[in-house]
């Protein structure tokens, strides 16, 4: 059975220990952390160390910032790189496996006016390769992995599909950079989500889950047996990290996910 995790902001409780107690009772195997900007994640290091000592399982952190390593502005790119390197260091210090980030989020979409970004595709590619190389080398030095997450076309204009992420990662050529897949974005961008998982099996390092409408798994129409079956086929051994909006009673919505995924083939 595939392991499950819930992002920390979705879990009830005022401490990671309290959130972990709920998570375990609901059937989760881990908590995915959120990494805010301004080195906020590094400032939590003692809190995270105490939680780890108390048995909280925290394998991954997902970036939670307003700008990313593919930003148009050079200063924002530099800051995003520094923030991500710090998050990789912290997740390594608490025994985790890696950190997930998109190239950008909400910066530009080719599906919305003005339709043409201020930077060429060639310039985008050069900036992404430079950033991924720097982050990948830092991740390798820390013994963890950077997960590049493709986002849908309305949230990012650079990396939307797994094949685009795979091309960048193969060009970088570092084992410390892998794809972080997300079921919601794949439902929008991939003609056959299960097939594309099989096609890029060797590069998939992390997985986040929400349904076709961004609500919790079970609230939409995603073909979960096919998607989960593909992960089983490739021997995926990471977590399915819940990253979603919640519909209905939020506590019950979060509680429902592990059992739903199990019924669906996890």
Map each language-model feature to its residues.
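Histidine-acidic metal/acid-base catalytic patches
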Residues: 1-27, 52, 95-97, 133, ...
């Amino acid at each position: 059975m595939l392991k499950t995790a819930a992002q920390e902001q979705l879990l009830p409780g005022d401490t990671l220990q309290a959130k972990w107690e709920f998570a375990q009772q609901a059937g989760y195997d881990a908590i995915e952390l959120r990494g805010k900007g301004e080195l906020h994640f590094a400032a939590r290091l003692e809190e995270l160390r105490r939680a780890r000592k108390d048995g909280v399982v925290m394998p991954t952190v997902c970036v939670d910032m307003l700008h990313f390593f593919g930003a148009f502005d050079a200063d924002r790119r530099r800051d995003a790189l520094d923030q991500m390197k710090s998050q990789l260091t912290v997740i390594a210090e608490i025994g985790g496996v890696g950190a997930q980030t998109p190239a950008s989020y909400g910066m530009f979409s080719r599906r919305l006016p003005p339709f043409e970004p201020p930077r060429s595709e060639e310039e985008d590619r050069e900036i992404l390769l430079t950033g991924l190389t720097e982050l990948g080398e830092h991740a390798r030095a820390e013994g963890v992995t950077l997960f590049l997450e493709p986002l849908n076309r309305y949230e990012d204009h650079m990396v939307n599909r797994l094949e685009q992420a795979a091309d960048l990662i193969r060009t970088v050529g570092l084992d410390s950079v892998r794809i972080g897949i997300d079921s919601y974005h794949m439902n929008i961008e991939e003609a056959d989500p299960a097939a594309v998982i099989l096609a890029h099996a060797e590069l998939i390092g992390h997985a986040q889950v929400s349904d076709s409408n961004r609500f919790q798994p079970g609230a939409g129409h995603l073909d979960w047996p096919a998607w989960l079956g593909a992960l089983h086929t490739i021997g995926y051994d990471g977590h399915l990290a819940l990253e979603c909006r919640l519909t209905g009673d939020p506590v019950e919505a979060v509680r429902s996910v592990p059992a739903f995924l199990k019924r669906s083939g996890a």
